[in-house]
Every structure is written in C-alpha cells, then in structure tokens.
C-alpha cells in the first residue's frame, strides 16, 4: 500500500491548495466590487476632462500652450501601470508585450523611450529587459490616492516641459467586464484632438480670465493627472477580476486533479486487495 499512501498524500496536498485558491477567489471578488465602485466614481470626471481637453485641442486658442503643439519625435515617455502582486493570470505580461511591440516600433525609427513605472511587477520586468526606468512608485495597495502618483507624473511632465520628451503616453489595462481586460496605450501629450465628429465640424474661440497661460498650465496638468489616476483604478479593477478568474480556474483544476488521483488511488487499492486475495488463495491451495 506504499503507492496508495503516496497518492493519499497527494490528494490531501491538492485539497489544501484548493482551499487556499478558493479563499483567494472570494477575497478577489470582494475587492473587485470595491475597485469597480471606485473606478465608476472617478470615470465621469476623467471622461469630462477628456471632453474639455478635446474642445481645447480643436479650438482657436489665443495662447498656444506647449502641450498642444506637435514636435519632431526624438524621445517618448510612458507611464506604465502594472500590479504590485502576481497570481492574476496574463494581465501584466499581455500589457508588457503590447508596450514592447510599440517600443520596438519607435526604436526602429531611431526614437528612444523613457519609462515611469507604477507597480512593482512593471519595475522588475523592465529592469530585467533593460528598459530605461526613470521613475517608479510601488506598494500603493488597494486604495491608491492621487498624491502617491504625483512623483512619476511630475518627473515625466518636467522632462516634457524641458524638451527631453516629445510624446507622453499612459499604459494600463482597461476594465471591460469581469472576463475581459484590454491593454491600452493612450497618448497624453501633446494633447490629441478629439475624435468626436461634431467637434471636428466646429471650432471655438475661448476667452480666458484672468490669464490663459496660468489657467491652461493648471488645467492641462490636472488633465494628465486625472487620466493617469483613472488608468490606475481601472488597472486595479482589472487586477482583481483577473485574479478572481485565475483562482477560480485553479480551484476547478484542483477538483479535476483530485478526481483523477482518487481514481488512481482506487485502482491501486483494488490491485493491492486483489494481490492479497490471490496470495491467500494460493497459500490455501498449497496446503
């Protein structure tokens, strides 16, 4: 019965692992609901800011802010939003693959890339592949605040203001639903013109009080901060959804493995009993 004992030990081990993955699935489901609420609360502000900026980009402005002007591209920057923890399926690696493909396209044109990382998984990955990480923030937890993001955002905006960057993007996972999270790369600077057909057919003249430069400086920075924050909360909701799905799959796979091991155990036990009976019958026949 040595084989049967070993199989029993494997079954017990899988059952213990299954309990852990089931608990993690339930925790992720609870955190996902909270993350979705936070995402839904911030999304209207981010969307409205995007519309306002779309108006500005299409407007006839008396003061042309540097964030509105296209430049010859020699260096681009990416604010990359990843997770601090693993066990969330292919969420991070799918995002990294998309970014690496875009970085290669820039590299083929002779354009260099700077990276500001939000999340420890992105930091470790891009350090390992030789990415130029110029800023990072990790360990923000399940309730990130805008103040925690100011560091990387400030570094990239300062580089853009000084002409060391010619384009700036935010890279994150967009939450569609529990089963679908899409890696996205969104241009922040220079401000992209709105894709709204109505806006393209019209133009606006703006009057600024008191000073257009001061107003636009504040508004455009708020816009960048709001889009990065929205990317973070969307990525957090995506993380919890992906983890819940991954842990459910692990729990289900554990159940299937237990059934297979139980079948192997029953066969081994049956073979052992058959062998013992054969030995008894053979011994009786010999007598």
From Swiss-Prot:
One of its GO terms (molecular function) is proton-transporting ATP synthase activity, rotational mechanism. Disulfide bonds: none annotated. GO terms for cellular component: plasma membrane; proton-transporting ATP synthase complex. It is a peripheral membrane protein. InterPro entries: ATP_synth_F1_ATPase_gsu (IPR035968), ATP_synth_F1_gsu (IPR000131), ATP_synth_F1_gsu_CS (IPR023632). Produces ATP from ADP in the presence of a proton gradient across the membrane. The gamma chain is believed to be important in regulating ATPase activity and the flow of protons through the CF(0) complex. HAMAP family: ATP_synth_gamma_bact. F-type ATPases have 2 components, CF(1) - the catalytic core - and CF(0) - the membrane proton channel. CF(1) has five subunits: alpha(3), beta(3), gamma(1), delta(1), epsilon(1). CF(0) has three main subunits: a, b and c. Belongs to the ATPase gamma chain family. This is ATP synthase gamma chain. It comes from Klebsiella pneumoniae subsp. pneumoniae (strain ATCC 700721 / MGH 78578).
């Amino acid at each position: 019965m040595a084989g049967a004992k070993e199989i029993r030990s494997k079954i017990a081990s899988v059952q213990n692992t299954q309990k852990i993955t089931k608990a993690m699935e339930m925790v992720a489901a609870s955190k996902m609901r909270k993350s979705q609420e936070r995402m839904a609360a911030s999304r209207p502000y981010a969307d409205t800011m995007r519309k306002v900026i779309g108006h500005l980009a299409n407007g006839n402005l008396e003061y042309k802010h540097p964030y509105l002007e296209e430049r010859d591209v020699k260096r681009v920057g990416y604010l990359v939003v990843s997770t601090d923890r693993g066990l969330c399926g292919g969420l991070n690696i799918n995002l990294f693959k998309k970014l690496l493909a875009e970085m290669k396209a820039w590299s083929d044109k002779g354009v260099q890339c700077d990276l500001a990382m939000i999340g420890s998984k992105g930091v470790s990955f891009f350090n390992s592949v030789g990415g130029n990480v110029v800023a990072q923030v990790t360990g923000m937890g399940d309730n990130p605040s805008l103040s925690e993001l100011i560091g990387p955002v400030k570094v990239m905006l300062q580089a853009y203001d000084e002409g060391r960057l010619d384009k700036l993007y935010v890279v994150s996972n967009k939450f569609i639903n529990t089963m679908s999270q899409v890696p996205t790369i969104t241009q922040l600077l220079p401000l992209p013109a709105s894709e709204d057909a109505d806006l393209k057919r019209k133009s606006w003249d703006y009057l600024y009080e008191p000073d257009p430069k001061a107003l636009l400086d504040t508004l455009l920075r708020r816009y960048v901060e709001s889009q990065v924050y929205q990317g973070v909360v969307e990525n957090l909701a995506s993380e919890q959804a992906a983890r819940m799905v991954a842990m459910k799959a692990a729990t289900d796979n554990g159940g299937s493995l237990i059934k297979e091991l139980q079948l192997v155990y029953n066969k081994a036990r049956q073979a052992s009993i058959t062998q013992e009976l054969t030995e008894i019958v053979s011994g009786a026949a010999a007598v």
